[in-house]
C-alpha cells in the first residue's frame, strides 16, 4: 500500500511537470516579462530594450530562465524526495530491503522521461526560431537608411535614404555621394593587368563595397561619433568594414551584427532593420568584435530625438555642408558631444597616458 502511494506521488509530480511546462509553452515567449525586482533578477543583467525586437528578445530570455528554474525545482524536488524517502538507513529501521522497488522496466515512466525532455527541447527551439525570425525580418519599410562603416578604431555614419516626411529636401532623399562612389568603383580592379588576388581576382585595395554619402558623421580620436536617429520610426542599418572585422552593437538593442569587409564575398547579410526606437535619449554603442589594440575604445553614440528634431537636424546638415555634427546638434538644442561615453586617443604613437581629451566632452 505504501509503495503504491509513493508511486502515485511520483506520477503526480511528473504529470505536474508536464502540465506546468505545457502551460509555459502555450504562453509563448512574447508574453511580457515580470516587472519589478523579480523581473530585474530574472533578466540576469540584461538591459531593458528600446526597440520592439529587443523587447521580444528580452521576454524570450526571461521566460527561458523561468522555464529552466521550474524544471530545476521539479528535478531538485524529486531528487531530495527520493534521497530521503528511499534511504538505506530509513529502510533498515523499517525492516525493509536496502534497495527500493526497481522501476527500470516501467514503460509508462520511461516514456514520460523520454517524451518530456523532447517536448522541452522542441518548445525552446520553436520559440528561439520565432524570436530570431522577428528580429532578423527585413519587412519594416524603413524611413531612414544608415550606412555604417567600421574601421580601426572608429566609425563613420552616413544617411543613404530618408523618407519625404523627414527629408531635408521635402521629398524622398537619396544621400549617395556619386562622385566618391564612382571613385571607389574604380578601385575594384588593378589597372593595367590581371588580378591574381584572392578576392575573386579583385584588387587588394578594393573599396567599391563601401558606401559614401553626402551627409556623414566621422569619428576621430578627439570626438565620439554621434549618430542621430528619429524615435518611433523604422530604421535600416547597412554595415561594412574598411579593414578588419568589427561588430555594430548597441546594448539597448540587445542585438549586434558583424561588419565585414567585402560582405557579399563573405556571404554575409550586411543589413538589419528595427521597427522603431521607443525611447529618446543617448545610448552608447560599441564594437563587439576583437579588432586590435584599441578595440575596447571603439565606441559611438546613438542620439534618439523626435522626428521633428531629426528633420531639423538633417536640414541643417544639408544646408550647411561645412558645419560639424556638433554644430548641427546645437542647432536643435541637443548636447553637441557624446554624453554616454568619452573619447580616447587611439593613435598608435600615444605613449604618455594622455588618452582622455576633456575638452571634447565639455
From Swiss-Prot:
GO biological process, one term: ATP synthesis coupled electron transport
Similarity section: Belongs to the cytochrome c oxidase subunit 2 family.
Biological role stated in the UniProt entry: Subunits I and II form the functional core of the enzyme complex. Electrons originating in cytochrome c are transferred via heme a and Cu(A) to the binuclear center formed by heme a3 and Cu(B).
Protein name: Cytochrome c oxidase subunit 2
Enzyme Commission number(s): 7.1.1.9
Top EC class of this enzyme: translocase
PANTHER family in the cross-refs: CYTOCHROME C OXIDASE SUBUNIT 2, CYTOCHROME C OXIDASE, SUBUNIT II
Residues the entry annotates as binding Cu cation A2: 287, 289, 291, 295
Binding positions for Cu cation A1 per the UniProt entry: 246, 287, 291, 298
Lipid attachment, kind S-diacylglycerol cysteine: 29
Lineage of source species: Bacteria, Bacillati, Actinomycetota, Actinomycetes, Mycobacteriales
InterPro entries membership: CcO_II, CcO_II-like_C, Copper_CuA, Cupredoxin, Cyt_c_oxidase_su2_TM_sf
Subcellular location: Cell membrane
Annotated S-S bridges: none
Cofactor(s) named in the record: binuclear copper center (CuA)
Manner of cofactor binding, per the entry note: Binds a binuclear copper A center per subunit.
Organism: Corynebacterium diphtheriae (strain ATCC 700971 / NCTC 13129 / Biotype gravis)
Keyword terms, alphabetized: Cell membrane, Copper, Electron transport, Lipoprotein, Membrane, Metal-binding, Palmitate, Respiratory chain, Signal, Translocase, Transmembrane, Transmembrane helix, Transport
Residues in the signal sequence: 1-28
Membrane topology: Multi-pass membrane protein
Catalytic activity as recorded in UniProt: 4 Fe(II)-[cytochrome c] + O2 + 8 H(+)(in) = 4 Fe(III)-[cytochrome c] + 2 H2O + 4 H(+)(out)
Ranges of biased composition (kind: Basic and acidic residues): 176-191
GO cellular component: plasma membrane
Region (Disordered): 171-206, 325-362
Amino acid at each position: 500500500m505504501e509503495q503504491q502511494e509513493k508511486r502515485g506521488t511520483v506520477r503526480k509530480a511528473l504529470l505536474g511537470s508536464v502540465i506546468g511546462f505545457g502551460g509555459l509553452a502555450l504562453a509563448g515567449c512574447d508574453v511580457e516579462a515580470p516587472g519589478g525586482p523579480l523581473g530585474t533578477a530574472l533578466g540576469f543583467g540584461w538591459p531593458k530594450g528600446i526597440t520592439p525586437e529587443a523587447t521580444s528578445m528580452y521576454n524570450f530570455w526571461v521566460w527561458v530562465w523561468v522555464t529552466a528554474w521550474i524544471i530545476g525545482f521539479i528535478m531538485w524536488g524529486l531528487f531530495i524526495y527520493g534521497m530521503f524517502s528511499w534511504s538505506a538507513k530509513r529502510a533498515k529501521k523499517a525492516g525493509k530491503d536496502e534497495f527500493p522497488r526497481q522501476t527500470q522496466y516501467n514503460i509508462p515512466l520511461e516514456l514520460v522521461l523520454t517524451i518530456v525532455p523532447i517536448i522541452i527541447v522542441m518548445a525552446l527551439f520553436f520559440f528561439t526560431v520565432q524570436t530570431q525570425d522577428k528580429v532578423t525580418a527585413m519587412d519594416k519599410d524603413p524611413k531612414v537608411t544608415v550606412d555604417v562603416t567600421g574601421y580601426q578604431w572608429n566609425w563613420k555614419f552616413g544617411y543613404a535614404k530618408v523618407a519625404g516626411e523627414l527629408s531635408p529636401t521635402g521629398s524622398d532623399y537619396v544621400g549617395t555621394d556619386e562622385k566618391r562612389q564612382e571613385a571607389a568603383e574604380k578601385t575594384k580592379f588593378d589597372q593595367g593587368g590581371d588580378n591574381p588576388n584572392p578576392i575573386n581576382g579583385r584588387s587588394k585595395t578594393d573599396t567599391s563595397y563601401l558606401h559614401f554619402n553626402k551627409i556623414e558623421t566621422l569619428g576621430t580620436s578627439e570626438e565620439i561619433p554621434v549618430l542621430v536617429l528619429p524615435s518611433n520610426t523604422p530604421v535600416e542599418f547597412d554595415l561594412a568594414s574598411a579593414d578588419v572585422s568589427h561588430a555594430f552593437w548597441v546594448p539597448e538593442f540587445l542585438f549586434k551584427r558583424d561588419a565585414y569587409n567585402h560582405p557579399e564575398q563573405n556571404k554575409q547579410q550586411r543589413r538589419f532593420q528595427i521597427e522603431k526606437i521607443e525611447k529618446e535619449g543617448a545610448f552608447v554603442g560599441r564594437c563587439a568584435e576583437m579588432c586590435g589594440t584599441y578595440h575596447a575604445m571603439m565606441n559611438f553614440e546613438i542620439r534618439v530625438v523626435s522626428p521633428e528634431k531629426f528633420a531639423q537636424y538633417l536640414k541643417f546638415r544639408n544646408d550647411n555642408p561645412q558645419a560639424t555634427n556638433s554644430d548641427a546638434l546645437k542647432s536643435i538644442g541637443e548636447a553637441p558631444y557624446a554624453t554616454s561615453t568619452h573619447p580616447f586617443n587611439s593613435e598608435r604613437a600615444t605613449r604618455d597616458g594622455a588618452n582622455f581629451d576633456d575638452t571634447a566632452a565639455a
